Every structure is written in structure tokens, then in C-alpha cells.
């Protein structure tokens, strides 16, 4: 869903940090 995609993107950014 929409939330799932949002978390996935956020997690990706957090892992990159």
C-alpha cells in the first residue's frame, strides 16, 4: 500500500545515512 512504499523509501534513506 501507500504507507508500505513510504516506509520502504524512508528505510532506504536511513540505511544510506
Curated annotation (Swiss-Prot):
Official protein name in the record: Conantokin-Ca2
Function noted in UniProt: Conantokins inhibit N-methyl-D-aspartate (NMDA) receptors.
Domain of life: Eukaryota
Modified residues (4-carboxyglutamate): 3-4, 6, 9, 13
Keyword Transferase: no
Tagged with keyword GTP-binding: no
GO CC term (a single one): host cell postsynaptic membrane
Any GO molecular function: toxin activity
Additional remarks: The mature peptide does not contain cysteine residue.
Compartment(s) of residence: Secreted
Tissue: Expressed by the venom duct.
Keywords (A to Z) from UniProt: Gamma-carboxyglutamic acid, Ion channel impairing toxin, Ionotropic glutamate receptor inhibitor, Neurotoxin, Postsynaptic neurotoxin, Secreted, Toxin
